[in-house]
Amino acid sequence: MTSDATAQLLALITSVLYASALVSARAGLRYSTPTTVTLFSILMQNLLLWSAVFASGGVHAVPLAGVLLFTVVGIFQLGVRLLAYTGAEKIGASRSSALQSVSPLVSATIAVAILGEEPSVLIVVGTVLVVAGIVLVSWKPEQQLAAFRRWHLLLPLGAAFLTGMNHPIRRYVLTMANEPLFFSALMGTVSLAGFLIYLAASPRSQKLVWARKAFWPFVGTGLFETLSILLIITAISMGRVVVVAPIAASYPIWALIEARIFLRQMEPINLKTVLGIFSVVAGNVAIHLGK
């Protein structure tokens, strides 16, 4: 199996794992809060990944520039979480998810302009199909929000932009030092520090609820999200951003399927949903054939 093919497989597994993290979090959020699951997930990420780093021989030599750039990535990742949660609160989860789905287009643009990657026509077509499919599946009619403001749309778009920037930065750093495990752990530490600062700066608006019934779902969330972070960084170390990013972004499809199976959420499968799933599948096939 070529490195590009392996990267695609890891990106696909990443999308399934991240969808599992979202579904598991949704189960726990019946008894707790988004702030709690975010902190729980970041703590597990640090515990698991730093344990793996030291179990595999400790920290290897990495350039300072790489450490600094992945520190920026960790800050961006925290920004993605906060913007995504706030966007879901302000304009609804489905609209927020649909707008965030443009992130592969941002990643591809930066990868082509700065990293010099050259996507084939099939990869470009596949990326557009994946984004269009995610929008079709994610966007659902929701009630009008009295407090809605047009600038609220910038929240999920900001999350998409930060996500799109993260992938090329990761790819660049991994060409300097191919240490995906260490950089994944470093990103978790930066996210934890940033999140604790955020909690200290806004204690009244952020509520931590430690509920027993939420414990195991949040353990699942932390485990799935940690594995998804490690695998996406490993995938980017092996393959081009223009190939990996759109495949990893197809997680809303898997979240829809898993929610029906594990949460018994019987969302209607209408023509729009079928077209969206077909578009994502066709897009992934096109990306694979165009590699």
Region spans (language model):
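Transmembrane alpha-helical core residues of multi-pass small-molecule transporters
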Residues: 41-45, 103, 129, 187-191, ...
